[in-house]
Every structure is written in C-alpha cells, then in structure tokens.
C-alpha cells in the first residue's frame, strides 16, 4: 500500500480544510507523539520489527550519479549501510558500540575503525530503530511542541527533541496523517555544528508499519541533496550478527 503525502494533500481540497481544523486545535506533546505512533502502525507493530532490510538506490549530484544501496538494521542498535557502483562497494557499520567502514573510493580496501564523531550519524540511525519519538522519556530525551511551521506549503506540527548528549532534532509532522515529513538534526562533529535536513515521503505499509520509501537529505539550506529511493523493504529478515562485526585481519602468507 502506497501513501504519497504530497500528492494527497495537494489534490484533495477537503484535506486542506482538515489541516486548518487540526492546526487550530491546542495540542500537547504527548498527544502528538501518540498520534504519530498510531499513524506509523501502532506501538505493537513497531516493536514487532526485530530487523529491517531496505534495498534501493542513492542519487547524488542532483541525480547525475547513482549508487545501488542496501541498508540493514537489527535490534538493539546495529546498522549496516552498503553503496555500490561500478563493482566497488562502500560499507559503513555500527555494531552497537562503535563504527567502522570500508571505503574503496578513497583508495582503502581494508576495514578501518571510525572515531566517535564519525560514528555519530550511524549510532543515531541504529539507536533510533523505532523512531525518535518512541520511548523518548526512557531514552532520557526532552521533547517540546513548538507549534506549527510551513514545510513546502504544509502547515506542519514542529517538535523539538533534545538528546542527553546535546544533539537536537526537530521533527515536522503532517497535520492530517501525523507522519514525519521533515526532520532537522543538529549535532557537533569534530567541533563543527552540523544541521542536516531530511525530507520524507512516499510512505508504504510493510508488515503493518508505514515506512518512507523516498527521502532527500542534505545540509540545511543546500539545494544539493542526496535522494534515496527504496524499492524493497523486508521486515524481520534473518540477519547474522557477523555482518556487523569488524572483519578479522586476513592472514598473510
């Protein structure tokens, strides 16, 4: 089942009226979080996901450069990203404690450890397998509702989530469907403040959970964004922990 938020909102006038009514309501953070979780499929369906494998393509340089990608997630906090082009595969992994990568595009074919700063994005993706708003209190985060803000013509609900490590994420929810349509992640890497913006859409329901099949990610304000297009999503595939482990050194003969 495919749900295109932008198409639905733009083509149906009654949804615009509904948006105005929803926006006029005085919302609390708890209500919006509950609405978001329900919209995604419900807490039971979300927690039933023990692993997730996404296959698709990554478009760079405004679509001029294409890579085949595979993203594999596994509880409690493991993730593996693979991007392949012309027979070369770049691999980035977070094993639950630290990150590592193999980057043949920089002339390095052997695995190398990543610093804690370089692993931040991977660690966040792995630890937020359920989504940032699920169990935010248990994660030690602070959440505030900041009212509504225009997101490309949609008056979205804006939520600020502050993590214990100081990172901040702004989450924008569609006023009708309560699914994420944009996130803005602010974090410090190597002493530099980064602001990464991600637009989400083309939601499909897989095993009872809505998953965005199209995302665009880049620095806030930049027109050059990476576009990810998923063509296959597998919920609860068998995933061996070995795929996340740092490869053993090859014996030299």
Region spans (language model):
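Positively charged n-region of N-terminal signal peptides that target proteins for export
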Residues: 1-6
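Bacterial N-terminal signal peptides
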Residues: 8-18
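Sec/Tat signal peptide C-region and signal peptidase I cleavage site
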Residues: 19-23
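N-terminal mature ectodomain segment of secretory-pathway/periplasmic proteins
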Residues: 24-25, 29-107, 140-147
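Extracytoplasmic
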Residues: 49-51, 76, 138-140, 154-156, ...
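Gly/Pro-enriched, hydrophobic low-complexity segments
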Residues: 88, 148, 152-249
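Acidic/charged, solvent-exposed loop-and-adjacent secondary-structure segments enriched in E/D, K/R, S/T
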Residues: 100-129
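Short, conserved active-site entrance elements at the starts or edges of catalytic domains
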Residues: 122-160, 179-182
